[in-house]
């Protein structure tokens, strides 16, 4: 029976003859088992070839001699597979764990005829992953098992014997379900259910809740500081620029702005540039944007240094920085490098202008016009200077003299400068009282007066019930007892369809009845 094997010198198959002698049969069976393990180590499935039914007849004399195959232990078969995998690295660039299928090992150990036929089938298709020119020693069966156990992980036997795909699928299914179950368990532990709360098993720790509230309050207070710290750390990564670098970036920005303007004008006129020229113009525009961003990022620290001067005036520090950044963008767009000044000198004025304008528009609860804000700032500056010179608070006349305005105008400006405060503002170190608790409400109704007024209404109603319907109606409309709005005689006459004189007569007659002691006595107590 002939089998083919790839030659080490050439890729052409070379035929060789497999004899059926007893020694060759035993060697062939052993070689077949080792090649089966080697094929498993290289990643190809040898079990299909090893389990094929024997299609050729085998001589009876060679069968008893093949029982030497059954004396090969499983561990030695695995050791041979490990050695073969180490000597024959895969040409495909990947390596897998040595794994011998159970079916191939079982047939190699129990059926010599099938093992011999497996050797013939493997020899017929020599597709072992061996590098050309490299010899694979398949007869090296005497390996040191102690050394092999040191090299292989303790669970190598389990890996070699785990060829059942169903076990792997079960493990994968369990692994897929485990994270979800763990998450559910965590949620149940972290968040007590409504049933637990209702049953009384869940006990709320007051000390812990107070600590959490205090920690949350501290976090809110430090949130702004943390944001500023993170922002300063981020902008500090950009290196500062020298004068030459600023001029170079300014030239690139100018070229980008010019290219953008030119393309916009051509687009408005409906003209189209050639593809190559349009591509160059687009590149110049993008380069100008990159230079603009670089110049901006390198001067963000200038904005922070200027914004520090305006803290404590009604705007948060981060808001001042953002408004200053808008002024910095404006300065980058209008910077003229031909003047010979540094960019920071020019940008400072734009940053200050943006910050002061934002404070005038956003810092106050009630917005004040920008020109009045400038007057208020000037008055405050003069007031501080006079305080240092005189050692006392200046009078309105002294302020008016310095500002060249009237004292009345100074008082008016000082009224505008006042800022409203919240009635919910806390008072004291403990913060348990609010400002509104100490301010009297002059329009609030006193409880005693409210009760007295209610009793007076009841007494008036009882007295008016003793009069006729027209008389009681005229009195109610004349004195506004119903809605608090008194009516004239003409208005009452229009209501009843009579003249104003008739309404006057009814009023006079009704008042005489009300002055009778039987009616007026119950109302005299409310005159005090």
From Swiss-Prot:
This is RNA polymerase sigma factor SigA. Was identified as a high-confidence drug target. The lineage of its organism: Bacteria, Bacillati, Actinomycetota, Actinomycetes, Mycobacteriales. Residues 100-109 have a biased composition (Basic and acidic residues). The gene is sigA. Its main location: cytoplasm. Residues 374-450 are annotated as: Sigma-70 factor domain-3. Induction: Constitutively expressed under all conditions tested except for 3-fold reduction in stationary phase, standing culture and upon growth in H(2)O. 2-fold induced by starvation. Half-life of over 40 minutes. Residues 1-10 have a biased composition (Polar residues). A motif (Interaction with polymerase core subunit RpoC) lies at residues 319-322. GO terms for biological process: DNA-templated transcription initiation; response to water. Residues 463-516 are annotated as: Sigma-70 factor domain-4. Residues 1-211 are annotated as: Disordered. Residues 110-173 have a biased composition (Acidic residues). Residues 295-365 are annotated as: Sigma-70 factor domain-2. One of its GO terms (molecular function) is DNA binding. Pfam families: Sigma70_r1_2 (PF00140), Sigma70_r2 (PF04542), Sigma70_r3 (PF04539), Sigma70_r4 (PF04545). Residues 19-31, 38-56, 80-92 have a biased composition (Low complexity). It is found in: Cytoplasm. Residues 489-508 bind DNA. Residues 225-259 are annotated as: Sigma-70 factor domain-1. One of its GO terms (cellular component) is cytoplasm. Keywords: Cytoplasm, DNA-binding, Sigma factor, Transcription, Transcription regulation. PROSITE patterns: SIGMA70_1, SIGMA70_2. Interacts transiently with the RNA polymerase catalytic core formed by RpoA, RpoB, RpoC and RpoZ (2 alpha, 1 beta, 1 beta' and 1 omega subunit) to form the RNA polymerase holoenzyme that can initiate transcription. Interacts with WhiB3 and probably with RbpA probably via its sigma-2 region. Sigma factors are initiation factors that promote the attachment of RNA polymerase to specific initiation sites and are then released. This sigma factor is the primary sigma factor during exponential growth. The sigma-70 factor domain-2 mediates sequence-specific interaction with the -10 element in promoter DNA, and plays an important role in melting the double-stranded DNA and the formation of the transcription bubble. The sigma-70 factor domain-2 mediates interaction with the RNA polymerase subunits RpoB and RpoC. The sigma-70 factor domain-4 contains a helix-turn-helix (H-T-H) motif that mediates interaction with the -35 element in promoter DNA. The domain also mediates interaction with the RNA polymerase subunit RpoA. The keyword Cytoplasm applies.
């Amino acid at each position: 029976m002939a089998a083919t094997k790839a030659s080490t010198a050439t890729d052409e198959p070379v035929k060789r003859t497999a004899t059926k002698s007893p020694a060759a049969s035993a060697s062939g069976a052993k070689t077949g088992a080792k090649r089966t393990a080697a094929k498993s180590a290289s990643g190809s499935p040898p079990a299909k070839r090893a389990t094929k039914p024997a299609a050729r007849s085998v001589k009876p004399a060679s069968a008893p001699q093949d029982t030497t195959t059954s004396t090969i232990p499983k561990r030695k078969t695995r050791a041979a597979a490990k050695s073969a995998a180490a000597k024959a690295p895969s040409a495909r660039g990947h390596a897998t764990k040595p794994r011998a299928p159970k079916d191939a090992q079982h047939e190699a150990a129990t059926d010599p005829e099938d093992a011999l036929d497996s050797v013939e089938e493997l020899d017929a298709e020599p597709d072992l992953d061996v590098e050309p020119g490299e010899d694979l020693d398949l007869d090296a069966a005497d390996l040191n098992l102690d050394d092999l156990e040191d090299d292989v992980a303790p669970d190598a036997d389990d890996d070699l014997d785990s060829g059942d795909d169903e076990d792997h699928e079960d493990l994968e299914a369990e692994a897929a379900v485990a994270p979800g179950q763990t998450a559910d368990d965590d949620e149940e532990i972290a968040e007590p259910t409504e049933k637990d709360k209702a049953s009384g098993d869940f006990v709320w720790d007051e000390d812990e809740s107070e600590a959490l509230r205090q920690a949350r309050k501290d976090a809110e207070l430090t949130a702004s500081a943390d944001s500023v710290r993170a922002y300063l750390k981020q902008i500090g990564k950009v290196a500062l620029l020298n004068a030459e670098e600023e001029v170079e970036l300014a030239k690139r920005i100018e070229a980008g702005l010019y290219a953008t303007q030119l393309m916009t004008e051509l687009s408005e006129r409906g003209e189209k540039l050639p593809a190559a020229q349009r591509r160059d113009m687009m590149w110049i525009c993008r380069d100008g944007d990159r230079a603009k961003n670089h110049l901006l990022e390198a001067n963000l620290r200038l904005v922070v240094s200027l914004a520090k001067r305006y803290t404590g005036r009604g705007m948060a520090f981060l808001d001042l920085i953002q408004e200053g950044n808008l002024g910095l963008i404006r300065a980058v767009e209008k910077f003229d490098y031909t003047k010979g000044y540094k960019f920071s000198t020019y940008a400072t004025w734009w940053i200050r202008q943006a910050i002061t304008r934002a404070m005038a528009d956003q810092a106050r609860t009630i917005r004040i016009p920008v020109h009045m804000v400038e007057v208020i700032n000037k008055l405050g500056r003069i007031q501080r200077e006079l305080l240092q010179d005189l050692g006392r608070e200046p009078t309105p006349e002294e302020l008016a003299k310095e500002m060249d305005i009237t004292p009345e105008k100074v008082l008016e400006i000082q009224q505008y400068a006042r800022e409203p405060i919240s009635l919910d503002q806390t008072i004291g170190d403990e913060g348990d009282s609010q400002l509104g608790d100490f301010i009297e409400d002059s329009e609030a109704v006193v409880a005693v007066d409210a009760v007295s007024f209610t009793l007076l209404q009841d007494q008036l109603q009882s007295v008016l019930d003793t009069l006729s319907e027209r008389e009681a109606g005229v009195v109610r409309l004349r004195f506004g007892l119903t809605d608090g709005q008194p009516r004239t005689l003409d208005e009452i006459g229009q209501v009843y369809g009579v003249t104003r004189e008739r309404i006057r007569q009814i009023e006079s007659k009704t008042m005489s009845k009300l002055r009778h002691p039987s009616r007026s006595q119950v109302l005299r107590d409310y005159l005090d």
